[in-house]
């Protein structure tokens, strides 16, 4: 062992490196993967594959719940790259902010197993955009998530009509899926009861 380093501190050092894997994934995504991605339209489905590393898993030997949002952040970033919007939005200093998310876990993802995340914009209203994300493997659907968010610039929300226009989308807004409509109503009820 290096001078002054005990076996415990060495173990903690390696644990720290393992937890850096999200940063490594982000750097790989930004500096390599986005340069070699396919192109999709604004309402297209983006797909990216990952593997559940041991550092992504918990004592139940499956992908820990706290990792799902981290993978989702990466997948949404990749979706913007596939749409051809990532560089443009960064140049405009438009930053995405999640307002709400709802998760339905169906089956677990075991250590070292590959899984794919499907990400797509399912619609928007006068204030928010809505995204659906699915975790899928050869075993089937593992988790489905709905995300509601906005883009902000200098502390102010980017109007949805400006965002959609910048994305080059000119068709009418798609109708929100029924489950998203009910979720939206539920969020409104929570807001009314708690503010």
Model-derived features: where do they sit?
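A glycine-rich, hydrophobic loop/mini-helix early in the fold
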Residues: 62-104
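Catalytic strand-loop segment that frames the active site of acyl-thioester-processing enzymes
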Residues: 22-78, 183-195
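Short, flexible turn/loop "capping" segments at secondary-structure junctions
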Residues: 43-44, 95, 166-170
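HotDog/MaoC-like acyl-thioester-processing domains
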Residues: 2, 6, 12-36, 109-116, ...
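Generic structural detector for well-ordered beta-strands
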Residues: 49-53, 104, 150
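Short coil/loop residues immediately preceding or within conserved phosphate-binding loops
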Residues: 47, 98-100, 130
């Amino acid at each position: 062992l290096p001078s002054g380093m005990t076996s415990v501190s060495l173990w903690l050092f390696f644990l720290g490196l393992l937890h850096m894997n999200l940063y490594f994934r982000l750097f790989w995504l930004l500096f390599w993967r986005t340069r070699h991605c396919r192109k999709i339209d604004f309402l297209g489905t983006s797909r990216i594959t990952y593997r559940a590393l041991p550092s992504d898993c918990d004592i139940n030997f499956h992908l820990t719940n706290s990792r799902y949002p981290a993978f989702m952040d990466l997948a949404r970033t990749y979706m913007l790259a596939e749409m051809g919007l990532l560089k443009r939005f960064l140049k405009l200093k438009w930053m995405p902010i999640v307002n709400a998310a709802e998760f339905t876990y169906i089956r677990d993802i075991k250590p070292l197993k590959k899984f794919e995340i499907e990400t797509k914009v399912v619609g928007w209203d006068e204030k928010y955009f809505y995204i659906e994300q699915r975790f899928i493997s050869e075993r089937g659907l593992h988790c489905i998530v709905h995300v509601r968010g906005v883009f902000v610039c200098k502390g102010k929300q980017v109007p949805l009509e400006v965002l959609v226009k910048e994305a080059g989308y000119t068709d009418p807004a798609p109708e929100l899926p029924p489950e998203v409509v009910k979720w939206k109503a539920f969020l409104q009820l929570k807001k009314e009861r708690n503010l």
